């Protein structure tokens, strides 16, 4: 059986990247929460 996680840099960036997060209200909320927490990396 094929494993479920087949990594792709493009798919990762498009689904979880900074620009995608900024494109929705809830995505911006995620970024704000990560900034508040002091995350070094905000998005993929």
Curated annotation (Swiss-Prot):
One of its GO terms (molecular function) is structural constituent of ribosome. Keywords: Ribonucleoprotein, Ribosomal protein. Gene3D superfamilies: 1.10.287.3980. Residues 1-44 are annotated as: Disordered. GO terms for cellular component: ribonucleoprotein complex; ribosome. The gene is rpmH. The keyword Ligase does not apply. PROSITE patterns: RIBOSOMAL_L34. It comes from the Bacteria. The keyword Translocase does not apply. Belongs to the bacterial ribosomal protein bL34 family. One of its GO terms (biological process) is translation. InterPro entries: Ribosomal_bL34 (IPR000271), Ribosomal_bL34_CS (IPR020939). This is Large ribosomal subunit protein bL34.
């Amino acid at each position: 059986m094929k494993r479920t996680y087949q990594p792709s840099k493009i798919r990762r960036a498009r689904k979880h990247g900074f620009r995608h997060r900024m494109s929705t209200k809830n995505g911006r909320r995620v970024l704000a929460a990560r900034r508040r927490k002091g995350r070094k990396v905000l998005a993929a």
